[in-house]
């Protein structure tokens, strides 16, 4: 099985988009990319906007090769909407290229969903239904694609139990010799998700960590995330790719240090330098103004 991480916070944008090739089936997972419109009270720096365009081009390139597209939930960093969005680098043309003629395995648009995502799901389906090859609501279901199985979890909370951000579905890809789980915005904060991952016993887990950058609003999430991921590591011995929300926090290397097995970011998996641009937005704006700043990565 071939796994290609496409876009994420360690690559400079908000995303967990991944391309997987298994048994001749090409699968694009969560094909969205976005920037946080405000961080430290600041809009995205110029280099963030440039990186967003670069990641968009990469996602479109892999979309052209994909047979199957999966969507874990309807936030714009996990699917590409059909409107022109500056901070999503989205357009109808991009969306059509991703979804037209594809098998879409997607989070249920009406069950276990909050109001905001229900509206987004309705808009998505209105545009995707006429152009997709087939659309299946994937929650809790398994699909056999000629020797490759895609098994989806039941809907689990986006973060901790009772999260107002709604629900997501995880996906297990099994080609008979290797098992990979993509667990997008579980944030390692709810038991249902942790237990499902342990039960499925993957060889590789791709997941997003807790949103510790939110400070008081995410109180206790650091400790819970460490505890839950260490449990997954002990029970499965899976290789871990950890990225997304946790990498919006400058302290993410310390989080990685507390784990019993050190994960890789998307950048680390690709053997390139981590560039957590959003976490360093304040410094990037100063740099744009010609001020001298220290950054833990190269720019330009």
From Swiss-Prot:
Q: Which family does it belong to?
A: Belongs to the UPF0282 family.
UniProt-recorded name of the protein: UPF0282 protein TGAM_0379
* Pfam families membership: Lactamase_B_2
Under Gene3D superfamilies, the record lists: Ribonuclease Z/Hydroxyacylglutathione hydrolase-like
Q: Which NCBIfam families match?
A: PRK04286.1-6 (NF003290)
**Native source organism of the sequence:** Thermococcus gammatolerans (strain DSM 15229 / JCM 11827 / EJ3)
Quote the InterPro entries the UniProt record gives.
Answer: Metallo-B-lactamas, RibonucZ/Hydroxyglut_hydro, UPF0173_UPF0282_UlaG_hydrolase, UPF0282_hydrls
């Amino acid at each position: 099985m071939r796994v290609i991480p496409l876009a994420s916070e360690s690559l400079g944008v908000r995303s967990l988009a991944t391309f997987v090739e298994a048994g001749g089936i090409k699968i694009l997972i969560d094909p969205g990319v976005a920037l946080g419109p405000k961080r430290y009270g600041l809009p995205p720096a110029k280099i963030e906007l440039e990186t967003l365009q670069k990641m968009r081009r990469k996602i479109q390139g892999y979309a052209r090769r994909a047979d199957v597209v999966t969507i874990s939930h309807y936030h714009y960093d996990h699917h590409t909407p059909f409107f022109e969005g500056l901070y999503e680098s989205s357009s109808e043309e991009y969306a059509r290229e991703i979804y037209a003629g594809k098998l879409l395995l997607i989070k249920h648009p009406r069950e276990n969903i909050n109001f905001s995502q229900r509206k987004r799901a309705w808009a998505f389906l209105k545009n995707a239904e006429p152009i997709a090859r087939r659309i299946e609501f994937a929650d809790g279901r398994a699909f056999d694609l000629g020797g490759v199985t895609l098994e989806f979890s039941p809907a689990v909370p986006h973060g901790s139990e009772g999260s107002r951000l709604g629900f997501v579905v995880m996906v297990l890809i099994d080609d008979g010799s290797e098992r990979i789980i993509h667990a997008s915005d579980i944030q390692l904060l709810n038991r249902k998700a942790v237990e499902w991952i342990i039960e499925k016993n993957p060889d590789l887990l791709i997941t997003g960590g807790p949103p510790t950058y939110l400070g008081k609003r995410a109180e206790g999430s650091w400790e819970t995330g460490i505890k839950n991921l260490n449990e997954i590591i002990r029970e499965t011995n899976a290789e871990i790719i950890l990225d997304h929300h946790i990498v919006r926090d400058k302290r993410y290397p310390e989080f990685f240090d507390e784990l019993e097995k050190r994960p890789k970011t998307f950048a680390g998996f690709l053997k390139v330098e981590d560039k957590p641009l959003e976490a360093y937005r304040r410094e990037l704006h100063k740099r744009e103004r010609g001020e001298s700043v220290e950054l833990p990565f190269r720019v330009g």
